[in-house]
Amino acid sequence: MAQVQYSGTGRRKNAVARVRLVPGTGKITVNKKDVEEYIPHADLREVINQPFGVTETKGAYDVIVNVNGGGYAGQSGAIRHGIARALLQVDPDFRSALKRAGLLTRDARMVERKKPGLKKARKASQFSKR
């Protein structure tokens, strides 16, 4: 018997997450590790669970994630985006709730590039009048 699974791809900053939802108990596995082990910050783990809170499907699906690129914050945002997209495959009626919460929109903010002659993207060396 083939197991039902739903997939979605999420992106944030330089992170890309490939998410699979399988009907289960709510266990989240990121890169073959438990989410508590992989992401040490509790607030970022809450970010990951936001789509389930909005759609009231907490504990209904096991989440298997492959994520690469970026840091903890970018990866958490990418996982959230991927879960939201996968939940659309579960039930297209979730679209309005997820859209209202802003979970389907790809966050387009990226790190601004460093400019020549400056120390960082916008930080210049101290100005001396004389």
UniProtKB/Swiss-Prot annotation:
Taxonomic superkingdom: Bacteria
GO cellular component: a single term: cytosolic small ribosomal subunit
Family under the similarity heading: Belongs to the universal ribosomal protein uS9 family.
Annotated InterPro entries: Ribosomal_Su5_D2-typ_SF (IPR020568), Ribosomal_uS9 (IPR000754), Ribosomal_uS9_bac/plastid (IPR023035), Ribosomal_uS9_CS (IPR020574), Ribsml_uS5_D2-typ_fold_subgr (IPR014721)
Name of the protein described by the UniProt record: Small ribosomal subunit protein uS9
Pfam families reported in the protein's UniProt record: Ribosomal_S9
Listed HAMAP family: Ribosomal_uS9_B
PROSITE patterns: RIBOSOMAL_S9 (PS00360)
GO molecular function, one term: structural constituent of ribosome
Gene Ontology BP annotations: translation
Record keywords: Ribonucleoprotein, Ribosomal protein
Keyword hit for Glycoprotein: no
